[in-house]
């Protein structure tokens, strides 16, 4: 493990931002440098977002860690991710659900789909779909967990409908990140603080 990566993990522990050892081990295991563009490899463990294609970014490591921690993923679960990007978040989720779990990840930008497929070729429990993420993926629903890596103006009902009862969704709404638990069919919100994300867009390109 690089000194920069170790320093990040120690920072999360010391500040209490992320304390779940399983999450920390999954992040430790997945090499972020394999999910950034080649010219940014040396910056892989800077705690900031890095450019990808089509004005998209790979989220900063602390944001990924906080979202993953909030999702409370367990082995064997089925997780829907909206916004594959380079595949980094999906790789971490793959480690957490294990061989009996499944990650369905949707990306609207074809260039990113191709990049993520190359990056995730050794993650056999990850299925990448080129589609409009705002519609979710009904074929595999319902999901134990849903994570959205782009900001919506309000809770997308189509996605929430695909979440199991007592399931958890982590999603940015406007400029705040929320952990939403489905209780008796209704959303229970927990505000995780101020975060900046690219917008959640319809359609595919």
Model regions and ranges:
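Conserved SAM-binding loop and adjacent beta-strand
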Residues: 17-18, 33-40, 50-68, 72-73
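Core SAM-dependent methyltransferase catalytic element
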Residues: 177-205
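Generic structural signal for secondary-structure transition and capping sites
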Residues: 32-35, 125, 168, 197
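Cytosolic histidine kinase catalytic core of two-component systems
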Residues: 21-22, 62, 111
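N-terminal auxiliary segments of SAM/dcSAM-dependent transferases
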Residues: 1-39, 204
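Short clusters of hydrophobic/aromatic residues that line enzyme substrate/ligand-binding pockets
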Residues: 35-36, 45, 50-52, 97, ...
């Amino acid at each position: 493990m690089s000194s920069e990566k170790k320093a990040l993990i120690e920072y999360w522990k010391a500040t209490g931002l992320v304390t779940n050892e399983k999450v920390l081990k999954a992040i430790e295991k997945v090499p972020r440098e394999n999910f950034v563009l080649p010219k940014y490899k040396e910056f892989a463990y800077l705690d900031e977002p890095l450019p990808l294609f089509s004005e998209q970014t790979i989220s900063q490591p602390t944001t990924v860690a906080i979202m993953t921690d909030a999702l409370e993923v367990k082995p064997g679960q089925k997780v829907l991710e909206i916004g594959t990007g380079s595949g980094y978040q999906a790789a971490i989720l793959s480690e957490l659900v294990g061989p009996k779990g499944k990650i369905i990840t949707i990306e609207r930008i074809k260039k990113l789909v191709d990049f993520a497929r190359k990056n995730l070729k050794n993650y056999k429990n990850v299925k990448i779909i080129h589609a409009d993420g705002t519609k979710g993926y009904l074929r595999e629903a319902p999901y134990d967990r849903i994570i959205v890596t782009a900001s919506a103006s309000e809770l997308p009902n189509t996605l929430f409908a695909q979440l199991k009862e007592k399931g958890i969704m982590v999603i940015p709404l406007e400029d705040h990140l929320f952990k939403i638990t489905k209780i008796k069919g209704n959303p229970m919100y927990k505000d995780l603080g101020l975060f900046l994300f690219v917008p959640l867009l319809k359609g595919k390109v």
